[in-house]
């Protein structure tokens, strides 16, 4: 409705951007999904790293993204589709990630007071993937090298070093 209203104002260009957070870790298994054992054994992994339980697409994310696009097309929405996985991997987010690194302390001072105490202990704006399990880790960061983008985490006694850039 908003886009239609804006289209009637000649000087305002509009674009509906549909953004998929398909890099998020799967938190729970939906009840209406076939082959739910596929999802159960992949809890915590990014949706793009989980096989499609319907068996039609490369990943559960591709299935969900395709369903979303079909729905929007059914109602004649004109839209641009963006995938967080693709944007991380192709470097689209690198400048923003650099800015988050530069402003890390300021960001933490704003975010931490809004979180429950348990999440406050583990919160970090950067969520690494565990190299052993492929799961999205929600663990506190030990070190951030702002110039290089290297970050270090402690994952159950094992130090993980990764880079915030390019996925």
What is the role of each PLM region?
Residues 1-108:
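N-terminal Rossmann-like or analogous alpha/beta NTP/dinucleotide-binding catalytic cores
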Residues 73, 77-167:
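Active-site cores that bind ATP or allylic diphosphates and position pyrophosphate for catalysis
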């Amino acid at each position: 409705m908003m886009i239609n209203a804006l289209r009637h104002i000649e000087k305002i260009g509009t674009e509906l951007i549909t953004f998929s957070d398909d890099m998020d870790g799967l938190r729970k298994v939906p009840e209406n999904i076939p082959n739910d054992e596929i999802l159960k054994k992949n809890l915590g992994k990014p949706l793009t790293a989980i096989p499609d339980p319907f068996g039609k697409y490369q990943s559960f994310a591709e299935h969900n993204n395709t369903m979303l696009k079909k729905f929007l097309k059914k109602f004649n929405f004109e839209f641009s589709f963006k995938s967080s996985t693709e944007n991380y991997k192709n470097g689209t987010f690198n400048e923003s990630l650099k800015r988050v690194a530069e402003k890390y302390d300021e960001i933490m001072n704003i975010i931490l007071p809004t979180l429950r105490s348990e999440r406050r202990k583990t919160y970090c704006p950067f969520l690494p993937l565990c190299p052993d399990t492929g799961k999205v880790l929600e663990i506190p960061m030990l070190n951030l090298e702002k110039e290089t983008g290297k970050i270090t985490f402690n994952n159950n006694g094992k130090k993980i070093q990764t880079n915030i850039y390019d996925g």
